[in-house]
Amino acid sequence: MTGWQTYSERYPMLTAALAHAKRSDRMSHAYLVITSNPDFRTDFPLLLAALRVCENQRPDGGPCMECGECRQILNGIYPDFHILAPTSRAREIVIGKDSGDPDTLRWFESQFHLSSVSVSGWKIGVIQEADTMNESAQNAFLKTLEEPPGKCLFV
């Protein structure tokens, strides 16, 4: 995975703005990542998540990548990290019948209304290929973005 230092060198304005937002406790509850770079699409949401939950920020404002929360994010074992990606044959994200319907928007959203079990209390959600959401899923997620549950980060 590409680290914070590499992103700081490649995208200094972006990382400086995010680090400042974290230091001043003004990080947004949602970030939209648009890129054709597959590594950026994979790595950057993890770095954002680590920045949000990090217990020991670096002097430059980035995540330490060594505390318990950062290690859990990097190792893919952070208990409140959820990914939604298109899985149907049509390659679209659908709303689903109810919260018990896995890999649907209703299931994904239901994960953020449960109590957090992580030390930081933050819940992280990543929607991969958000442009594949069908119209009903888009409308449902828009409501969540307008009125987000507490201590949630969506990428």
Provide a role label for each language-model segment.
Residues 1-136:
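Clamp-loader machinery-focused feature within the broader ASCE/P-loop NTPase space
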